[in-house]
Amino acid sequence: MMLSKLDALTLDNSFAALPDTFYTRLAAQPLGRPRLLHANAEAAALIGLDPAELHTQAFLEVASGQRPLPGGDTLAAVYSGHQFGVWAGQLGDGRAHLLGEVRGPGGSWELQLKGAGLTPYSRMGDGRAVLRSSVREYLASEAMHGLGIPTTRALALVVSDDPVMRETRETAAIVTRMSPSFVRFGSFEHWSSRRDGERLRILADYVIDRFYPQCREANGEHGDVLALLREVSQRTAHLMADWQSVGFCHGVMNTDNMSILGLTLDYGPFGFMDAFQLGHVCNHSDSEGRYAWNRQPSVALWNLYRLGGSLHGLVPDADALRGVLAEYETLFTQAFHARMGAKLGLSVWQSDDEALLDDLLRLMHDSRADFTLTFRALAQAVRGQTQPFLDYFIDREAAQAWWSRLAARHACDGRAAAVRAEGMDRVNPLYVLRNHLAEQAIRAAQQGDASEIDRLLGLLRRPYDLQPGAEAYAALPPDWAAGLSVSCSS
């Protein structure tokens, strides 16, 4: 594979070719005395960028907002949305600057600086991102990719001593993040709320032609738009099944944080569950628990209805739109059962397996069992070592009775225990980005030390593989981790 220097990348800038009502062209506001804290060679390969370029002064200048991407077209996009279930009106990229779109071996990727200064859409914000939240986003996007879950990616993390005020004084940072597109549900809501059918159609055509060309083959009047909604609904359903299956909580599933491509987008107050609780809320700011773990699939459907309502300006037949969205629950349930069945070591999901899963989750809830390690221990039990699994439960007799039910189910499945256990280890991760692991990386980064970021990325790229010397990263959280909380402050 031929890798390029920064000024030789192939750029497309398709979003910038839309009418200028979709964005504002502007220059980034550079960080003072920026330093490259970490760069991601794996992400660089996607756009054909030579990893050596990541450590050049030219790249630092681009990643810190000092100069535009060669051949790029820097802009901030406008969108609207519902936040915590309430219409928030116009929003937009309040601190993100889209540098351009690069075509490389891994497809087309938009490059965006998050934390690069004020835009016309900043509202009450300062246009900056703090080091704390930037480290979390940088790590989380790569952790999700390692888990096989659709996500934006992270290319680089640049830091500065520039002060930023949140609850306390912090320092500024910029994440260079990558996505095939940053178009959101809220991008459609924006034009729908203005009853601007012309621009709504332009946006729909852009998304269809760029990302869902198969929708053009749909039959019937407005078939392409209905097919678009169906594709987005299907991808969203599968994304929710992915999240639920690894105990991931997004924390702020507003419609402006929902990707039109079904990607995990905008890592803020997210969290991977430690002690399992059905109604676990990872965002300290979510006082009503709207975005609790067990509500995420239904919130996603609520958000899809907001998207469907926006498309009503293009599809007058509301029943047709509702008919598409009526498919979501079946899509999600099938995807969720497939993932959870694999985690339980089942080749095919049967109707009785619903009770088996529900009973396990209830036992885990009652014991506050660790989500990741409890599921991981199931493969050990299949290999004949049941005690590690049972030790996660307060009521071990009930856990033993449950295990006996699963073992009986396995006996009807026909696979050898070793094959079954190996398959379970491939879908039950050993390493996830727990809050305390991210916090340790943040504390080191605040001292200019990126070694913990580097260590975590190495582990999280292979989350299903046992890695020697990494026992501490696969252990229960230390007691001090109970005091950690995350919020919308970033």
UniProtKB/Swiss-Prot annotation:
Query: Where are the catalytic residues?
Result: 256
**What keyword terms does UniProt attach to this protein?**
ATP-binding, Magnesium, Manganese, Metal-binding, Nucleotide-binding, Nucleotidyltransferase, Transferase
The record's annotation in Pfam families points to: SelO
| InterPro entries according to UniProt | SelO (IPR003846)
EC number, as in UniProt: 2.7.7.-, 2.7.7.108
Catalyzed reactions per annotation:
L-seryl-[protein] + ATP = 3-O-(5'-adenylyl)-L-seryl-[protein] + diphosphate; L-threonyl-[protein] + ATP = 3-O-(5'-adenylyl)-L-threonyl-[protein] + diphosphate; L-tyrosyl-[protein] + ATP = O-(5'-adenylyl)-L-tyrosyl-[protein] + diphosphate; L-histidyl-[protein] + UTP = N(tele)-(5'-uridylyl)-L-histidyl-[protein] + diphosphate
Entry cofactors: Mg(2+); Mn(2+)
Please give the Gene Ontology molecular function terms for this protein.
Answer: AMPylase activity; ATP binding; magnesium ion binding
Question: Coiled-coil annotation: which residues?
Answer: none
Q: Which PANTHER family match?
A: PROTEIN ADENYLYLTRANSFERASE SELO, MITOCHONDRIAL (PTHR32057:SF14)
NCBIfam families for the chain: PRK00029.1
* UniProt function note: Nucleotidyltransferase involved in the post-translational modification of proteins. It can catalyze the addition of adenosine monophosphate (AMP) or uridine monophosphate (UMP) to a protein, resulting in modifications known as AMPylation and UMPylation.
Q: What is this protein called?
A: Protein nucleotidyltransferase YdiU
